[in-house]
Amino acid sequence: MDKKYKLACSLTGNIFYLKQMLLFKEMNDFLICDVNARLNEKGIWCNPSRYDIEKAIRSQVFDKIFKKKLKIQNSFTENIEKSLKLKVLNLVGLSKKAGLLEIGYDKVIKSLKNNSIDVVLIANEDSKLEGAFLKIIDDRKILLNKTFSRSEISKAVGYKNVLCVAIMISNLSATLNSDFYKLMKFKLN
């Protein structure tokens, strides 16, 4: 990521790459989180930590920043997580349409050995595949993720009973990596 796109978090003051942050806006007195924000959009850029966001809501930090009393839905943080998951799954589906997706164990293993992928998704119901992939991945910079269920991955790619998929190295996989960062950082807390 380019260093010129670093910004201080409006909640904590910590420095993050802009692509790793979430954009919060005020719309009709409601606080909204735009997970699909472009880098040039205006609003409050914050780190994607659920803990920091919930703490800011309790302390009314967003009210102070926007200088008005904001309405915040009870399910605000759950909606952010759902939106981040949906964005990732949509990118997986888009990578299939673009011809950048390997589906199935054999194809993923072959692509891992050829160093042509940098994201691997494994259904969270499967316990055996992770070990097999970890042996091949070693110290390479490949994102291995078990966030989604078999049905979620299957629905995203349009097939039934998909246990694993891999995204080939591309701009799309770089975007997917930054969106996974946001999702994982949000889920950690």
Question: Language-model segments: what does each one mean?
Answer:
Residues 140-184:
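Short basic, glycine-rich beta-strand/loop surfaces that mediate nucleic-acid
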Residues 29, 98, 109-117, 127-139, ...:
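Active-site cofactor/cluster-binding pocket
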